[in-house]
Regions:
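Bacterial N-terminal signal peptides
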Residues: 1-7
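Carbohydrate-interacting regions of secretory-pathway proteins
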Residues: 10-187
Length: 187
């Protein structure tokens, strides 16, 4: 039912590219700009021996939207998509606190916890290959799909507010993650 509602609200609305495949135009890092680059049509977030954190934020802010992207990583990665603020994130990779993969699960930074866990991710996630993620954010409702299968249906108790989208390089982790085909459809 929730996927039908999301599809109905997208009729006639074209997605907008968040990344041109060549530059970081439209994005700004919170810190450590050297952690962010473009390589082979992808945004690359890569930490160094300092293992400091950085978030690459869109310059534009969004209310309700559908975010679509592809991501790829190998090894230990603790990353994700920040949605409208730094308190709500959809995880990619190993949770630092839980020490296991929590890809597609929401993390609430202000509360320091995962309120729910995405289902079926282990069977869908392809480590070292490109994975497709789609996150619908409408009011307090989050719906997530991984490689075409719905894995998350979550309602937050946080008040929604307009804000940017962020890509994360988590502190205290030596990691590299690639993002491409980033697009957003305002709802």
């Amino acid at each position: 039912m929730s996927l039908l509602l999301c599809a109905a609200s997208l009729e006639g609305v074209e997605p907008v590219a968040l990344f041109d495949g060549k530059t970081l135009s439209g994005w700004k890092p919170s810190a450590m700009p050297e952690y962010w680059s473009v390589k082979e049509d992808a945004i690359v977030g890569k930490s160094d021996a300092q293992k400091k954190g950085s978030i690459l934020w869109t310059e534009a802010a969004y209310d309700d939207f559908v975010l679509e992207a592809e991501f790829r990583y190998e090894g230990h990665v603790d990353s994700g998509f920040f949605l409208r603020n730094e308190n709500e994130q959809i995880q990619i990779g190993i949770s630092g606190s839980l020490k296991r993969d929590m890809t597609c699960s929401p993390y609430i930074g202000k509360k320091g916890k995962y309120p729910v866990e995405a289902v079926g991710v282990k069977d869908l996630l392809k480590i070292g290959e490109w994975n497709r993620i789609k996150i619908s954010v409408k009011g307090k409702k989050y719906i997530g799909t991984l490689n075409g299968k719905q894995v998350l249906d979550y309602t937050t108790d946080m008040e929604p507010a307009k804000g940017p989208i962020g890509l994360q390089v988590h502190p205290n982790v030596l990691m590299e993650i690639h993002f491409r085909a980033l697009k957003i459809t305002p709802l």
